[in-house]
């Protein structure tokens, strides 16, 4: 996310891209959704989930349109550079050469589509992978670019804090209990406090912090180096994730089918909407990774339809996961990390399955943590980078990795309330990335495209929400969400 134009990579079919996008969106946020559903009530949760899914789809089409406009501008600049080079090389050309060049220059002054020969690619074809940072540099002024990177950095800090808390929290829940020897995990009516004993004199919070320290020592050093997620590791973690989700849904359905469901969720409870909103926004987050995902798709003819199909499938999956959870488990017994509800012997008889589900977040999150950390570090470098300048070795190799790693670890040290961490990250930084940035990107790219190519040029990847009303509506919704969440937090604190 350093904001550069990067290699497109190996091409894949549109349906493979659909699967990749599904895997990208459905992540850690899905594991915190059941508790948020139970807290806010099933009807309010369903309505908000569908509406936020629709809003995420709208801004996803905005980003795709901006990607196409960025590709067209890059092609136009390459044509201009080529013309300048040809002008320099032909300064001593004959009169006939001059005549040919004059004709070419007159053609260059027409809109770009008029100089496209038959069979040449559409100027708005998405072939160059232009990351969001580069699009911000193309369409925003300096203040806008800095605000973009600030928003991305805050979101990535929240991401790392969630990851840093989720792994030790899962390990603590699996290995600790009130008595210290209960291998079946959390019982239905058991409420644990951080001060309860874990092993001998060690409290649960002590075990959590020990696991956090081990997690930081093992994965923190990767922040100081370059690391990327390999194809095979991605396949392995995706396979583990879908096995875990499938097992949880099936187990919950079996209990409900056998009339063992304990959940009686309310219809609506507006006190839980704040966290639900943040969790849902976080769970639909994909806009910042769309360039890496969409560009390698070989055929983009029906791209918008495929993206819409993906969102429908994701909505159905989130609904199935959350509704089976809230009707299978009592609302007060649902854990921040849904997998931990299956650590009970009366839910899962096989110890291997209990430990797999309990430790599943540990494996998947541990593979993502170094990637997110390196991405955040690179964004810090890009934010402070000056043209032609280089960083001293200490700043480049020590300062930037340190300011990347320390804050999220400190947040995780202070709290392991995953629902609140996900809610706040989604409600603030998530709102900026998912709503504000795409809306401003598409607004400025449309204006620049009209100036550069004329009114008659059509962007083949233009969003179906092409009226300016939708840009204003998205920004108004983002502002309303910011006010609502902030007011809700303030009112909640004053009641304590």
UniProtKB/Swiss-Prot annotation:
Pfam families: Aa_trans. Residues 1-10, 58-146, 226-233, 298-306, 376-397, 443-470 are cytoplasmic. It is found in: Membrane. Keywords: Glycoprotein, Membrane, Transmembrane, Transmembrane helix. GO terms for cellular component: membrane. Glycans are attached at residue 193. The keyword Cell inner membrane does not apply. The chain crosses the membrane at residues 11-31, 37-57, 147-167, 205-225, 234-254, 277-297, 307-327, 355-375, 398-418, 422-442, 471-491. The keyword Membrane applies. It is a multi-pass membrane protein. It comes from the Eukaryota. Residues 32-36, 168-204, 255-276, 328-354, 419-421, 492-496 are extracellular. Belongs to the TMEM104 family. This is Transmembrane protein 104.
């Amino acid at each position: 996310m350093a904001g550069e134009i990067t290699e497109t990579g190996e091409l894949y079919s549109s349906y493979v891209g659909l699967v990749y996008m599904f895997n990208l969106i459905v992540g850690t946020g899905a594991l915190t959704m059941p508790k948020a559903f139970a807290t806010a009530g099933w009807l309010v949760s369903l309505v908000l989930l569908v509406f936020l899914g629709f809003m995420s789809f709208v801004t996803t089409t905005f980003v795709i349109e901006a990607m196409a406009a960025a590709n067209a501008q890059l092609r136009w600049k390459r044509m201009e550079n080529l013309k300048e080079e040809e002008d320099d090389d032909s300064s001593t050309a004959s009169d006939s050469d001059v005549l040919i060049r004059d004709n070419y220059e007159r053609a260059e002054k027409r809109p770009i589509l008029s100089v496209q020969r038959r069979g040449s690619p559409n100027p708005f074809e998405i072939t160059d992978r232009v990351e969001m940072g580069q699009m911000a540099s193309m369409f925003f002024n300096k203040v806008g670019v800095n605000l973009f990177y600030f928003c991305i950095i805050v979101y990535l800090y929240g991401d790392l804090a969630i990851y840093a808390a989720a792994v030790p929290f899962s390990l603590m829940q699996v290995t600790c209990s009130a008595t210290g020897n209960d291998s079946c995990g959390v019982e239905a009516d058991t409420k644990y406090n951080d001060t309860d004993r874990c092993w001998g004199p060690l409290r649960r919070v002590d075990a959590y912090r020990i696991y956090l320290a081990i997690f930081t020592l093992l994965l923190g050093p990767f922040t100081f180096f370059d690391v990327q997620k390999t194809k095979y590791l991605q396949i392995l973690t995706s396979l583990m994730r879908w096995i875990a989700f499938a097992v949880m849904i099936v187990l919950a359905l079996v209990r409900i089918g056998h009339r063992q469901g304990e959940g009686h969720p309310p219809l609506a409870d507006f006190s839980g909407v704040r966290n639900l909103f943040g969790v849902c926004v976080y769970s639909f987050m994909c806009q910042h990774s769309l360039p890496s995902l969409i560009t390698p798709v070989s055929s983009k003819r029906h791209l918008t339809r495929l993206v819409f199909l993906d969102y429908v499938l994701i909505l159905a999956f989130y609904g199935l996961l959350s509704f089976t959870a809230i009707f299978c488990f009592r609302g007060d017994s649902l854990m921040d990390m849904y997998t931990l509800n299956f650590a009970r012997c009366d839910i899962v008889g096989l110890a291997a399955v209990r430990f797999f589900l309990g430790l599943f977040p540990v494996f998947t999150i541990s593979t993502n943590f170094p990637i997110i950390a390196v991405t955040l570090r690179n964004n810090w470098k890009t934010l402070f980078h000056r043209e032609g300048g280089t960083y001293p070795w200490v700043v480049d190799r020590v300062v930037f990795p340190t300011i990347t790693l320390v804050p999220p670890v400190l947040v995780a040290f202070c709290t392991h309330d995953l629902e609140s961490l996900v809610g706040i990250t989604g409600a603030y930084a998530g709102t900026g990335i998912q709503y504000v940035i795409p809306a401003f990107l598409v607004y400025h790219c449309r204006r620049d495209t009209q100036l550069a190519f004329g009114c008659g040029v059509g962007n083949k990847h233009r969003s179906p929400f092409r009226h300016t009303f939708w840009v204003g509506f998205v920004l108004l919704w983002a502002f309303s969400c910011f006010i609502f969440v902030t007011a809700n937090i303030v009112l909640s604190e004053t009641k304590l």
